[in-house]
Amino acid sequence: MKKKLKTFSLILLTGSLLVACGRGEVSSHSATLWEQIVYAFAKSIQWLSFNHSIGLGIILFTLIIRAIMMPLYNMQMKSSQKMQEIQPRLKELQKKYPGKDPDSRLKLNDEMQSMYKAEGVNPYASVLPLLIQLPVLWALFQALTRVSFLKVGTFLSLELSQPDPYYILPVLAALFTFLSTWLTNKAAVEKNIALTLMTYVMPFIILVTSFNFASGVVLYWTVSNAFQVFQILLLNNPYKIIKVREEAVRVAHEKEQRVKRAKRKASKKRK
């Protein structure tokens, strides 16, 4: 059910973004509410462009937006982590009720809901943050591509309106994309082909796409993905998650051994 809800939410969100993805110039005279939001983002970037450095404004505004959304990101990652932890038990339930008849489906759903409640897991908790984050990031992207005064200027000798001729920003954007996906998937309880492919395919797509995008847009991708890496290490460090998980397994194993020893002693005393 969670997959269906997430798929529906992504379809709905994609449809909404496609409606909002016009390519025309956005200005203070633009008519739609979405374009006014995009223009407000652009003006905020301009206000943060100290010494008329649009590149600096892009960096600062991206960091501010990302920092504001950190609680939502944390909520999403915590929910995803909990869902990963109970995946083996969910698969056991699916094996227990393999039937496709309504009665089996109902029993499976009831036991899954009981497990969610017992473990404090909300299967929908990772959807809401996603619905909020993506429109904000899309508005920021459109501000960089549809507002004229953000398409001019230089940053570290790079023309923000032109692709990076030295390929520095595309490589950095791809590198930070790889690191963020790799770190996110490192602590996954169960590895699968889809996760592995995403780890390597997404950075490649970002790299190739960035060759033809304006440097201002690629600068935004680079800063955004770099901040994503920082967020993961700060809030959902996979090394800490793995360490805690291994410690829990060790404690459970020791407890099991103590119970076995106690049973053996009790058995010897009876003899």
From Swiss-Prot:
The chain crosses the membrane at residues 45-65, 124-144, 163-183, 201-221. The keyword Hydrolase does not apply. It is found in: Cell membrane. GO terms for biological process: protein insertion into membrane; protein transport. Keywords: Cell membrane, Chaperone, Lipoprotein, Membrane, Palmitate, Protein transport, Signal, Transmembrane, Transmembrane helix, Transport. A lipid is attached at C21 (S-diacylglycerol cysteine). Coiled coil: none annotated. The keyword Transmembrane applies. One of its GO terms (molecular function) is membrane insertase activity. It holds the Pfam family 60KD_IMP. It is a multi-pass membrane protein. Residues 1-20 form the signal peptide. GO terms for cellular component: plasma membrane. A lipid is attached at C21 (N-palmitoyl cysteine). Belongs to the OXA1/ALB3/YidC family. Type 2 subfamily. Required for the insertion and/or proper folding and/or complex formation of integral membrane proteins into the membrane. Involved in integration of membrane proteins that insert both dependently and independently of the Sec translocase complex, as well as at least some lipoproteins. HAMAP family: YidC_type2. This is Membrane protein insertase YidC 1. The lineage of its organism: Bacteria, Bacillati, Bacillota, Bacilli, Lactobacillales.
